[in-house]
Amino acid sequence: MPTVGSLVYIMVELAIALLAILGNMLVCWAVWLNSNLQNVTNYFVVSLAAADIAVGVLAIPFAITISTGFCAACHGCLFIACFVLVLTQSSIFSLLAIAIDRYIAIRIPLRYNGLVTGTRAKGVIAVCWVLSFAIGLTPMLGWNNCHHWGEGENQSQGCGEGQVACLFEDVVPMNYMVYYNFFACVLVPLLLMLGVYLRIFLAARRQLKQMETQPLPGERARSTLQKEVHAAKSLAIIVGLFALCWLPLHIINCFTFFCPECPHAPLWLMYPAIILSHFNSVVNPFIYAYRIREFRHTFHKIIRSHILRRQEPFKAGGTSARALAAHGSDAEQVSLRLNGHPSGVCPNGSAPHPERRPNGYALGLVSRASARESPGDTGLPDVELLSHELHGASPESPGLEGPLAQDGAGVS
């Protein structure tokens, strides 16, 4: 008979699963609908959201099931126990890829579009998921406790022949969880991300100081770089929340492993730690909505148009939700980009390819200066203005003009 504590745990987990599914589906929906959000950085954001959706759909139900200690074949129980590790690892790799993407955008913006393409990003995402399955399912290859259960130990649990009481620590060895999963596959990537974001902020600070000595036109480049820093801060917050949510559970595992004579952590401590780790799958959409204007406006449009059924539809892959909210008419929706053309329209009238957008539109933080551009002006941009705006965005490349400068745009 489940205890009151177990019932509360199950109810909280189900609520988290529902929020994780709905919130992260909203993120994927926003990227699909809003062309301003269809950039390389957000490919990794969608991969992260997909992992969080899988936590709600699969990992949390698995965690609830395994908490009951039901009787099952050892390797079946082991797969259920390991699946959440796959999703955790995928989240970590996505966060690391985002950090590296933002580092390239700020440190070497003029090479960003050449180095970071949509095709390469999709390849990196595929590799990340393959590695996540390989790391998370490593216990299935033999690093497990199933051989112990072949010696009759399962009989004390009241399970039949060939079955075990399915509990996480009974099938997954703690040395795997501490040395391999935590130290090698969680802590090391988190430290790498800490180093990458530290270098991002130091590089941005150095460039901003250099801009202070430039004449007035450098203010546009300063604003551009500040938007990149704002995007980096938003993503660094997501990394910090990931660490905050997952470290308590890993710390408990370390105590269990390094102090076997100590009493095992009680359920009143284990349940909150497990819930906190799963709650991490809920928080990211709120960070996007709070910190990133383009996501916030798109979420608002989706809720109004598709959920509340108010008549404000917008085209997938076309103009942005922000432009629709501002103008309300397909003929007037302009949401200009740095190339001087309306959102969703190339000079030849074709739809744009997402991977060719300037790196400055990572996460959809659109420059207010470009948003105020005249709707009727669909001609070529003012090359001199672009040159001044981008002057000083990178210490390695002062004084670039025209098309070259456009590739290095640093708006975020």
Curated annotation (Swiss-Prot):
Record topology, Cytoplasmic segments: 33-42, 101-120, 199-234, 291-412
GO molecular function: calmodulin binding; enzyme binding; G protein-coupled adenosine receptor activity; identical protein binding; lipid binding
One of the GO BP terms on file: apoptotic signaling pathway
Disulfide bridge partners, by residue number: 71-159, 74-146, 77-166, 259-262
Topological region Extracellular: 1-7, 67-77, 144-173, 259-266
Keywords carried by this UniProt record: Cell membrane, Disulfide bond, G-protein coupled receptor, Glycoprotein, Membrane, Receptor, Transducer, Transmembrane, Transmembrane helix, Ubl conjugation
Subcellular location: Cell membrane
Pfam families, A to Z: 7tm_1
Region (Disordered): 368-412
Keyword Cell membrane listed: yes
Membrane-spanning intervals of the chain: 8-32, 43-66, 78-100, 121-143, 174-198, 235-258, 267-290
InterPro entries for the chain: Adeno_A2A_rcpt, Adenosn_rcpt, GPCR_Rhodpsn, GPCR_Rhodpsn_7TM
Membrane topology field: Multi-pass membrane protein
Major location (coarse): membrane
Modification note: Ubiquitinated. Deubiquitinated by USP4; leading to stabilization and expression at the cell surface.
Binding positions for adenosine per the UniProt entry: 169, 253, 277-278
Glycosylation-annotated residues: 154
Organism superkingdom: Eukaryota
GO cellular component: plasma membrane; postsynapse
Swiss-Prot/TrEMBL domain comment: The cytoplasmic C-terminal domain is necessary for targeting the non-ubiquitinated form of this protein to the cell surface.
Recorded family membership: Belongs to the G-protein coupled receptor 1 family.
Subunit structure: Interacts (via cytoplasmic C-terminal domain) with USP4; the interaction is direct. May interact with DRD4. Interacts with NECAB2. Interacts (via cytoplasmic C-terminal domain) with GAS2L2; interaction enhances receptor-mediated adenylyl cyclase activity.
Function: Receptor for adenosine. The activity of this receptor is mediated by G proteins which activate adenylyl cyclase.
Protein name: Adenosine receptor A2a
Gene symbol of the encoding locus: ADORA2A
